[in-house]
């Protein structure tokens, strides 16, 4: 079980999505 690796991968995928969503909300 590699929780740190999974958590790191989740951050790599999740953080850009949050930034994109925030940018979309700001544009709207």
Curated annotation (Swiss-Prot):
Domain of life, source organism: Eukaryota
Question: Keywords for this entry?
Answer: Membrane, Transmembrane, Transmembrane helix
- What does the record say about its membrane topology? Single-pass membrane protein
The reply on keyword Membrane is yes
Task: Give the UniProt subcellular location, in the record's own words.
Answer: Membrane
GO cellular component terms given for this protein: membrane
Which chain regions cross the lipid bilayer? 5-27
- Main subcellular location of this protein, as a coarse class: membrane
Name-wise, this protein is Uncharacterized protein YMR182W-A
Organism lineage reads as: Eukaryota, Fungi, Dikarya, Ascomycota, Saccharomycotina
